[in-house]
Design a protein with these regions (language model features):
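Short, positively charged and aromatic/hydrophobic N-terminal segments
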Residues: 8-17
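Helical element adjacent to the flavin cofactor pocket in flavoenzyme catalytic cores
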Residues: 168-190
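N-terminal Rossmann-fold NAD(P) dinucleotide-binding loop
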Residues: 41
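Beta1/beta-strand and adjacent pyrophosphate-binding region of the FAD-binding site
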Residues: 26-38
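Gly/Ala-rich phosphate-binding loop of Rossmann-like dinucleotide-binding domains
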Residues: 45, 49, 185
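Dinucleotide-binding Rossmann-like beta1-alpha1 core, especially the glycine-rich loop
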Residues: 74-152
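Glycine-rich FAD pyrophosphate-binding loop
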Residues: 49-69
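A short, basic/flexible loop-to-alpha-helix module at the beginning of a structural domain
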Residues: 16-29
Length: 190
């Protein structure tokens, strides 16, 4: 098994025995070791580097994003039923919006917005609950009428629909590109 180590803005490749590299180039210790080069591990590396941490190493047994990240859908919804998740999703979306400019590395992020349709009063009650959470974290959201739905998406057939939950900053990103942009950002931050 080979391991790829990303640290100090460098990319090292070694095998289990530590071969393939001169001994003086192999990282033997670090303040923080992050296992896994998917979007979560690289995000942690990026954020720590951005906060000024220097003694960081990321270990990945394959290539960056070679696990579940490369085939993830990359959806970035704001509609969450818990405060903590809503805050995380908002922070992630805000990061994806500025990451490409910061790193000059494409992320594939598109903020296209979304609509969740209500067919019964209970749906609208749930939307009101979630809107309270999103208002609290600062994520834009609104409960809209069928007339407003038609303005946003004129091709939706409105039979049985009584309203919708509109989150205009929902989007999607390319997980592999976003991960690579965060890896570049981590290198840029030292």
């Amino acid at each position: 098994t080979s391991y790829h180590l990303v640290g100090y803005g460098s990319y090292y490749i070694i095998n289990d025995e530590g071969k393939n590299m001169p001994e003086d180039k192999i990282v033997s210790h670090a303040k923080v070791g992050i296992i896994g080069g998917g979007i979560m591990g690289v995000s942690l590396l990026y954020h720590l580097a951005k906060e000024g941490w220097k003694d960081l190493v990321l270990l990945e047994k394959g290539e960056l994003t070679s696990g579940s990240t490369w085939h993830a859908a990359g959806q970035c919804p704001q509609m969450m039923g818990s405060y903590n998740l809503a805050k995380i999703h908002l922070e992630s979306t805000n990061l994806y919006k500025k990451l490409e400019k910061e790193t000059e590395q494409p992320t594939g992020f598109h903020d296209c917005g979304s609509l969740r349709l209500a067919y019964k009063k209970e749906d609208l009650d749930w939307f009101k609950y979630v809107k309270g959470i999103l208002d609290n974290v600062g994520a834009p959201a609104e409960i809209i009428s069928t007339n407003e739905i038609k303005k946003i998406h004129p091709f939706i057939k409105l039979d049985g629909i009584i309203g919708a939950f509109h989150t205009p900053e929902d989007g999607h990103t390319d997980p592999t590109s976003t991960t690579n942009a965060m890896a570049k950002g981590a290198r840029n931050h030292g």
